[in-house]
């Protein structure tokens, strides 16, 4: 089935009709601190997109950048380099800071079951292409040099700012989050290359035709995209906060460099809201994955919470909401565990084979419904609701419910199969009357020192995947 996504660029839904080599780029973290769960809501949305594309049969080439230089504290053209600022405060080098927080970011991604990109593009390792892009733009007379820095002249790009709202420019207003800079020709111009840093001892600098300096955040993403994906990008991901400045600047750089349209589809995820504000490091109102773990939450409790809301809707975060998601996720695992432990060996064997080998029409109808929901703008929240409908259904067998749950989990990534097995290892198996009779026979055999018969009964259970554990309270049956 063809995936439809809401395209911020066109303000309409776009169909992805090319199933071969879908090029996807996501704005990754600026590695000066731990990523917070507001950041991870966006990365979970990106993860859902990549997994949905692959689930539907698209061949995906997925890249993410790591910003280890040039992202200023103001997110614009003012302020100090965030990584350099943290390095100075902690008495470490910028390389030590960026390496530490990059590793921390991907460790948290693993805990949240966020897919690892096919290519990770570290900004400081791609300086030559950034310089080359600026040189080409300079040759086209799209840049100017002012106060030691190279600016992009937005008046040379007639469609500048369309994705954010062209009316802002028509009214000679400043776009959201853009400050006044007396060295700019136009209010919307932005720096491509800094040689005149406001801060002494800027550690990360490179030689360039304009002097020793460093690239802007906007140049980094555009240039690395052009280097890795060449002249075409299919989908660009990011948070809604990137629309008003960063992504329109990327579009301007790339399309002036290429002399043609660059990326057709931009997809943006909404904020995670806490105390009526977006979660933000600069505001000081942020929570990390480790903070959740310290309060006895699983990172997958947070992932479940994210699955309950569409990516284009703001999601309110509170400990109460997270606790509700924790309870719901545990209830889901408990119900699926009950189904699983009730299966006979034939059904268990079926689950280990082709999951999509559906036995009857009702099962296939639920599967088709799930595919339809995720194919229309990643409506995973409706897919999760459908999973609960399946669990409560009287028209499906236990093996059908489990099969559908495991299929859905290829995208939801709640580790359902693993969590079920872990759950069953920690809980006694519900046994029927025949099993109870055999356990009692084994108890009597052991009392009568008929160890041969006792071992035969033990081996009988073992062949069915059960382990008998003798305790003071009696014999318990557990999954092997």
Swiss-Prot record:
Q: Which domain of life is it from?
A: Bacteria
Alphabetically sorted, this entry's keywords are: Aminoacyl-tRNA synthetase, ATP-binding, Cytoplasm, Ligase, Metal-binding, Nucleotide-binding, Protein biosynthesis, Zinc
Give the Pfam families listed for this entry: tRNA-synt_1e
Cystine pairs: none
Cellular compartments annotated:
Cytoplasm
Amino-acid positions noted as binding ATP in the UniProt annotation, renumbered to this chain: 281
The UniProt record lists the keyword Zinc: yes
As cofactor, the record names:
Zn(2+)
Predominantly, its location class is cytoplasm
The UniProt note on the cofactor reads as follows: Binds 1 zinc ion per subunit.
The residue numbers the entry assigns to motif 'KMSKS' region are: 278-282
Instruction: List, alphabetically, the Gene3D superfamilies matched.
Output: Cysteine-tRNA ligase, C-terminal anti-codon recognition domain, HUPs
The protein's matches in HAMAP family, at most eight in alphabetical order, are given as: Cys_tRNA_synth
- Family membership noted in the UniProt record: Belongs to the class-I aminoacyl-tRNA synthetase family.
Name it: Cysteine--tRNA ligase
The scientific name of the source species is Borreliella burgdorferi (strain ATCC 35210 / DSM 4680 / CIP 102532 / B31)
Q: Which gene encodes it?
A: cysS
């Amino acid at each position: 089935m063809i995936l439809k996504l809401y395209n911020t660029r066109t303000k309409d839904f776009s169909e992805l009709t090319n199933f071969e080599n879908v090029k996807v780029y996501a704005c990754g973290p600026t590695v000066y601190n731990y990523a917070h769960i507001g950041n991870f809501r966006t990365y979970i949305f990106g993860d859902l997109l990549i997994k949905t594309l692959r689930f539907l049969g698209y061949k995906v080439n997925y890249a993410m950048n790591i910003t280890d230089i040039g992202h200023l504290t103001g997110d614009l053209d003012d302020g100090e380099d965030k990584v350099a600022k943290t390095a100075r405060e902690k008495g470490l080098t910028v390389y030590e800071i960026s390496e530490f927080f990059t590793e921390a970011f991907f460790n948290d991604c693993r805990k949240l079951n966020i897919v690892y990109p096919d290519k990770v593009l570290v900004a400081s390792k791609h300086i030559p292409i950034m310089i080359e892009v600026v040189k080409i733009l300079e040759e086209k007379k799209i840049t100017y040099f002012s106060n030691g820095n190279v600016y992009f002249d937005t008046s040379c790009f007639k469609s500048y700012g369309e994705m954010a709202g062209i009316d802002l420019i028509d009214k000679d207003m400043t776009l959201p989050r853009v400050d006044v800079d007396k060295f700019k020709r136009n209010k919307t111009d932005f720096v491509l290359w800094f040689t005149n840093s406001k801060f002494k001892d800027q550690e990360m600098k490179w030689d360039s035709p304009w002097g020793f300096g460093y690239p802007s955040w906007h140049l980094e993403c555009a240039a690395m995209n052009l280097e890795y994906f060449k002249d075409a990008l299919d989908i660009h991901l990011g948070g809604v906060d990137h629309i008003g400045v960063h992504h329109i600047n990327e579009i301007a750089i790339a399309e002036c460099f290429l002399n043609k349209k660059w990326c057709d589809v931009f997809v943006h995820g909404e904020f995670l809201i806490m105390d009526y504000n977006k979660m933000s490091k600069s505001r000081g109102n942020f929570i990390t994955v480790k903070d959740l773990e310290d309060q006895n939450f699983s990172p997958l409790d947070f992932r479940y919470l994210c699955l309950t809301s569409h990516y284009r809707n703001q999601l309110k975060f509170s400990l109460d909401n997270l606790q509700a998601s924790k309870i719901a996720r545990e209830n889901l695992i408990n119900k699926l565990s009950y189904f699983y432990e009730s299966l006979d060996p034939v059904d268990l064997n079926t689950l280990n084979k082709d999951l999509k080998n559906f036995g009857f029409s009702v099962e296939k109808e639920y599967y088709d419904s799930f595919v339809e929901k995720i194919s229309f703008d990643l409506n995973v929240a409706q897919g999760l609701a459908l999973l609960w409908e399946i669990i409560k259904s009287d028209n499906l067998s236990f093996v059908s419910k489990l099969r559908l749950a495991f299929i859905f989990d290829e995208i939801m990534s709640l580790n359902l199969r693993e969590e079920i097995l872990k759950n069953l290892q920690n809980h006694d198996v519900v046994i029927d009357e025949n099993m109870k009779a055999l356990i009692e026979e084994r108890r009597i055999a052991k009392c009568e020192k008929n160890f041969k018969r006792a071992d035969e009964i033990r081996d009988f259970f073992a062949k069915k995947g059960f382990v008998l554990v003798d305790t003071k309270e009696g014999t318990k049956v557990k999954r092997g």
